[in-house]
Regions:
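Short amphipathic alpha-helical interaction segments
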Residues: 31-48
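Short acidic, hydrophobic short linear motifs in intrinsically disordered regions
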Residues: 17-28
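Short alpha-helical segments that sit at the start of domains
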Residues: 1-10, 81
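Short helix-capping/turn signature of helix-turn-helix
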Residues: 13-14
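A short, conserved structural fragment
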Residues: 46-56
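Short, amphipathic alpha-helical interaction segments positioned at domain boundaries
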Residues: 64-81
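Short acidic/glycine-enriched loop/turn segments that link adjacent beta-strands
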Residues: 59-62
């Protein structure tokens, strides 16, 4: 999987905020990536329509979570491991 696909994978079961996506990369994906690079990827994925921001709640770090769009869910279904 590429880094954007790992972001999709982190969101498949539930909405996640930035901090949880960073933790996913550290703990699950075990990929070295900077927080800044994750921010850039998230921004690109928002623009591309793969994810959206869920403004209905914030986490303890005052971050809104991200959700998969239908386009993002379809992209996740087509990930080749």
């Amino acid at each position: 999987m590429n880094k954007k696909e790992f972001i999709l994978d982190s969101l498949i079961d539930d909405d996640e905020a930035f901090t949880q996506i960073v933790e996913y990369f550290e703990l699950v994906a075990e990929i070295e990536i900077s927080s800044e690079e994750i921010k850039i990827l998230i921004s690109e994925m928002l623009e591309e329509g793969y994810i959206t921001i869920n403004y209905s709640w914030k986490n303890e770090y005052n971050e809104y979570p991200y959700s998969l769009t239908e386009k993002g869910r379809k992209a996740w279904e087509n990930i080749q491991e």
